[in-house]
Amino acid sequence: AYAFLDQDAPDTANPSLWRDTQLNHIYGLFEVTDGIYQVRGYDMSNVTFIKGDTGWIVVDPLMSMECAAAAFSLVEENLGTFPVKAVIYSHSHVDHFGGVRGIISEEDVQSGDVQVIAPEGFEKHAVSENIYAGTAMGRRASYQYGTMLEASETGALAIGIGMGQSRGSTSYISPTLEITETGEKHTIDGVEIEFQLTPGTEAPAEMNFWIGSKNALWMAENCTGTLH
């Protein structure tokens, strides 16, 4: 569907958006650093897998269950089968939590086998934005992203942070641990993570985190290479 990208930008497309589309179309499993992996290009957002002592810490499980399940299958095929020990929602936009039930179940959480971690105020804003305003937002998105257009030199290209919104089933599981203070630290499956709350930034409820043992800083969508 995107073979037309194998050329320089035509006169019908903004060159920056054309290049952004070429880069977003590079998809698959990527090693970020030792023990941290991402599946990119499977949905509007990327999903991150952090290896703990016994299993995975999954960060932002995409928008739809089908995409999240496919991403997890790719990880297992290439990196082995390990249980999910925790899910972290970086912020309250649906493309960062909607696929959660494609990776874990409510039973996993209720049994205490899996933690679900989110910033303070996450559930309130996830509900207010995605339920109360969801229909209106969806209609506006069709104009913003050109979702009714075919992908072509004269049609739809990428949407800045990804190739587009997936059209599968969205889901939700409530957090079991809410981060309420910047500097708060938690050790999850042997990995110490320090959190920084960033409310009212790219989303009403959002947070960054730091993994000192990996020298890795996660900034969610507070830092993107687009005008998103």
Predicted regions and their residues:
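Conserved beta-strand hairpin/beta-sheet module of binuclear metal-dependent hydrolase folds
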Residues: 22-82, 206-211, 215-222
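Structured segments of extracytoplasmic/periplasmic soluble domains
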Residues: 77-81, 103-106, 125-140, 226
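Active-site metal-binding motif and surrounding structural segment of the metallo-beta-lactamase
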Residues: 54-55, 65-117
